[in-house]
């Protein structure tokens, strides 16, 4: 081992970026990568004509449609920290992938559009992060455009999300009138157009004000900001590191990711307060320290065809303890089998490099020949640990699926099983006829499934909508095939567990009344 484990762990910052679609999440990710020297030019996220696709949107359909449908993992160094960013899908149809990703991070950055405020998907994702009790940092984006009043945005954030907020900076104007940021925490003003100040971006504050001979000092917008800040300091919440660490207070930063304004200040301040890797909970209720000597981690994502030319499959592992060393032997907890971790990579979206050592907080990619499932625990030696189960979600949309070309059955089956293991869709088979049914939480999931089956597996599919909207599992010992009727569909999931698909709540209630001793269960 060539690294100091404690120093290495303490330098890690592993976080996810969450937002509603189009709030600017992918753009801010790219600006952070730019500061870390990981890329030379930020791609215009939806610049389909220029071909400058977002670095974190690597799948072909993401480039075509300008949306993130998979979670990307990116690592870079900045100052004395090693940063692991997990860029998650903002589209609500991909909430399953996002929720699982949020189990692999130590903090989260919430990006909000200054014109729109808190949106539906932001609220959903925030609740998942809040439940985990990890720190949440807020970046209110798009100051280069006209948006809502900053005080109004803070009030909405506190009311809708039930969390204290502390503004780290405050906008001096917005849109065409944007002059800069009053940096409360660092006691300086950050100028939007430094050329108006001899090229100097920052003006230090003295007694909360800038020198009176500067043109900005007499600006009415700046004078209004001084009043706003005074009000915030007197009437607002006090800055509390303890509350931030518990996820009870969110530091709020304003800026513009597109024009790269306020992003570097955000990054540097974020790194001061974002936590290093923490202890992870086990299924038995215990915890494993990141400084534990023996290696352990869990699979939170499986991705097929990251390199379509090689038709490969990668299991993404969050390291929780110990030091990963190339070629080490570990135990796969679910099966008890020994596995050699020899061909392991780290990522920049779809680009990767071999890794020889990694520690708690790092995300590594293990080549998967079909051994792994989402939620698997890997451990070294005699640890015999099992980490908490990752969330699964009950689909609300269902389709019957068949191969368009019967000669492509082999490709059809391979594609379906790989995409199911990724967690891209859920698969069921009708109990007697073994017809394939796929389930999703949103319509876009079906579109991506159809696209990937055709483009990655050369297996076009025919999808037939079903009336079913509710899936409920039952205990195998309660199953009687006579329970199947015109009001439901009896099926098995991929673990061979029986379930019923119902068209609506009325059909579900009818079943529950007829079989009162049978417990109907949902996933989450």
UniProtKB/Swiss-Prot annotation:
Assigned GO CC terms: cytosol
A Pfam family annotated for this UniProt entry: EF-G_D2
Gene Ontology terms describing biological process: regulation of translational termination
Start and end residues of each tr-type G domain: 10-278
Claim: GTP-binding is one of the keywords in the record: yes
InterPro entries: EF-G-like_DII, EFG_III/V, G_TR_CS, P-loop_NTPase, PrfC, RF3_C, RF3_dom_3_sf, RF3_GTP-bd
Keyword Cytoplasm assigned: yes
GO MF term list: GTP binding; GTPase activity; translation release factor activity, codon nonspecific; translation release factor activity, codon specific
Role description: Increases the formation of ribosomal termination complexes and stimulates activities of RF-1 and RF-2. It binds guanine nucleotides and has strong preference for UGA stop codons. It may interact directly with the ribosome. The stimulation of RF-1 and RF-2 is significantly reduced by GTP and GDP, but not by GMP.
Entry's family note: Belongs to the TRAFAC class translation factor GTPase superfamily. Classic translation factor GTPase family. PrfC subfamily.
Name the UniProt record assigns to this protein: Peptide chain release factor 3
Species for this entry: Enterococcus faecalis (strain ATCC 700802 / V583)
């Amino acid at each position: 081992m060539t690294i100091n484990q404690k120093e290495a762990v303490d330098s890690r910052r592993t976080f996810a970026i969450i937002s509603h679609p189009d709030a600017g999440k992918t753009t801010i990710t790219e600006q952070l990568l730019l500061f870390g020297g990981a890329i030379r030019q930020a791609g215009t996220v939806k610049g389909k004509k220029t071909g400058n696709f977002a670095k974190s949107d690597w799948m072909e359909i993401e480039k075509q449609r300008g949306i993130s449908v998979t979670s990307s993992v990116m690592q870079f160094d900045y100052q004395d920290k090693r940063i692991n960013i997990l860029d998650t899908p903002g589209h609500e149809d991909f909430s399953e992938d996002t929720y699982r990703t949020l189990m692999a991070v130590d903090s989260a950055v919430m990006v909000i559009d200054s014109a729109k405020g808190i949106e539906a998907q932001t609220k959903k994702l925030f609740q998942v992060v809040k439940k985990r009790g990890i720190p949440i940092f807020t970046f209110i984006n798009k100051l280069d455009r006209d948006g809502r009043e900053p005080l109004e945005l803070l009030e909405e954030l506190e009311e809708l999300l039930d969390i204290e907020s502390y503004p780290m900076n405050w906008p001096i104007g917005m849109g065409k009138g944007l002059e800069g940021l009053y940096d409360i925490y660092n006691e300086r003003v950050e100028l939007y157009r430094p050329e108006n100040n001899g090229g100097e971006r920052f003006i230090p504050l003295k007694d909360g004000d800038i020198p009176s001979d500067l043109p900005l000092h007499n600006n009415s917008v700046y004078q209004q900001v001084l009043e706003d800040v005074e009000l915030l300091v007197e009437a607002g919440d006090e800055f509390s590191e303890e509350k931030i660490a518990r996820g009870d207070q969110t530091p709020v930063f304003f800026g513009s990711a597109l024009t790269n304004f306020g992003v570097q200040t955000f990054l540097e301040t974020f790194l001061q307060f974002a936590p290093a890797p923490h202890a992870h909970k086990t299924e038995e209720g215990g915890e494993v320290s990141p400084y534990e000597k023996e290696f352990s981690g869990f699979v939170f994502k499986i991705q097929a065809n990251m390199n379509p030319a090689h038709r490969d499959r990668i299991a993404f592992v969050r390291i929780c303890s110990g030091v990963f060393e190339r070629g080490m032997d570990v135990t796969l907890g679910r099966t008890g089998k020994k596995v050699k971790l020899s061909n392991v990579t780290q990522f920049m979206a779809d680009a990767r490099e071999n890794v020889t050592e990694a520690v708690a907080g790092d995300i590594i990619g293990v080549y998967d020949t079909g051994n792994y499932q989402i939620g698997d625990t890997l451990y070294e030696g005699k640890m015999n640990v099992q980490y908490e189960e990752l969330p699964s979600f009950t689909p609300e949309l269902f389709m019957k699926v068949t191969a368009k070309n019967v000669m492509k059955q082999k490709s059809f089956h391979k594609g379906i099983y790989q995409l199911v293991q990724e967690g891209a869709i859920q698969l069921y088979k009708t109990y007697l006829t073994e017809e394939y049914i796929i389930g999703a939480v949103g319509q876009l999931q079906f579109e991506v499934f159809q696209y990937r089956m055709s483009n990655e597996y050369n297996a076009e599919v025919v999808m037939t909508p079903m009336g079913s909207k509710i899936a409920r599992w039952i205990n195998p010992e309660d199953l009687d095939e006579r329970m199947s009727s015109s009001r439901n569909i009896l099926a098995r999931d991929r673990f061979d567990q029986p379930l019923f698909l119902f068209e609506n709540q009325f059909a579900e209630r009818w079943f529950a009344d007829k079989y009162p001793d049978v417990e109907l269960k949902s996933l989450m």
